[in-house]
């Protein structure tokens, strides 16, 4: 039987021989931002490969292993070609690659609005303060809630956002308890998103957006309900959108 540590080692294996100064990228493309308070805006996405988490409802498993090497200069050049003022660094888990910190610095130096979407399991300390962080707090039904790095809450800025992906009423109740325990509604913008479109053959629990909307209304919590806009515009299984 594979131990938890060897499982993580296996997940990180694609990065083992990555040259210093290079990023293992999965895809770079322009689309409509589908989440966060930036939803609806044109955005360039830099999706880095490899993730150490395995959320049961993950909609980007294709980024676990597949990637190509690119220098920071190459990535910067490709982003700038789109002439789009908004860029998001996502994954995978982007903070697994140390070069991402310099990439974000250089993107911000060019005057771009830089978003970072991260699982919340890794230290946010080195992130450039100009970057807008969108951090997950993993709910129990994700299978990854034990990896939440609670110390990151003290590293977030008031302009950063915390996202909860909700797959059940139990997840929602956990979210409300967590918000209250850490006074999050007074500190950050909070996003709650339903798992309503899972990958084929996924065993993830799902809920309808209307269910989550009703729970949110009944709770009185000032969180923002979000539905992944890109999945309403295009096929939920489509890539590069």
List each model region and its residues.
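Conserved Radical SAM active-site core
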Residues: 10-11, 20-23, 27, 42-45, ...
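Conserved AdoMet/S-adenosylmethionine-binding subsite of the radical SAM
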Residues: 95-241
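Residue-identity detector for threonine
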Residues: 3, 7, 25, 37, ...
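Short glycine- and Lys/Arg-enriched binding-loop motifs that mark or flank ligand-binding interfaces
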Residues: 30, 36, 87-88, 240
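Short hydrophobic/aromatic-rich motifs at helix boundaries and adjacent loops
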Residues: 47-49, 75-76, 147-148
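Short, mixed-charge, low-aromatic patches
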Residues: 30-37, 60, 129-135, 166
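Flexible, acidic/Gly-rich N-terminal and inter-domain linker regions that tether
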Residues: 1-49, 53-57, 218-224, 233
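Generic structural signal for well-ordered alpha-helical scaffold segments
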Residues: 33, 76-80, 180
């Amino acid at each position: 039987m594979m131990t938890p540590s060897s499982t993580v080692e296996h997940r990180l294996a694609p990065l083992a021989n990555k040259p210093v100064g290079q990023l293992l990228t999965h895809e770079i493309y322009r689309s409509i931002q589908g989440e966060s308070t930036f939803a609806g805006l044109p955005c360039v996405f830099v999706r880095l490969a490899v993730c150490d988490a395995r959320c049961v409802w993950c909609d980007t498993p294709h980024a676990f292993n597949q990637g190509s090497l690119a220098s920071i200069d190459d990535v910067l050049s490709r982003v700038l070609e789109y002439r789009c003022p908004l860029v998001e660094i996502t994954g995978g888990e982007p903070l697994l690659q140390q070069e991402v910190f310099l990439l974000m610095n250089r993107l911000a130096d060019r005057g771009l609005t830089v978003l970072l979407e991260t699982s919340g399991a890794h230290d946010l300390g080195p992130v450039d303060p100009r970057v807008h962080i969108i951090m997950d707090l993993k709910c129990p039904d994700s299978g990854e809630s034990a990896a939440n790095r609670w110390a990151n809450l003290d590293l977030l800025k008031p302009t950063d956002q915390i996202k909860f992906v909700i797959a059940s009423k139990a997840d929602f109740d956990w979210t409300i308890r967590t918000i209250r325990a850490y006074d999050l509604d007074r500190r950050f913008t909070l996003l709650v998103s339903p798992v309503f479109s899972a990958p084929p053959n996924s065993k993830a629990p799902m809920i309808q957006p209307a269910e989550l909307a009703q729970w949110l209304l009944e709770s009185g919590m000032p969180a923002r309900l979000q539905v992944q806009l890109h999945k309403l515009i295009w096929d939920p299984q489509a890539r590069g959108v």
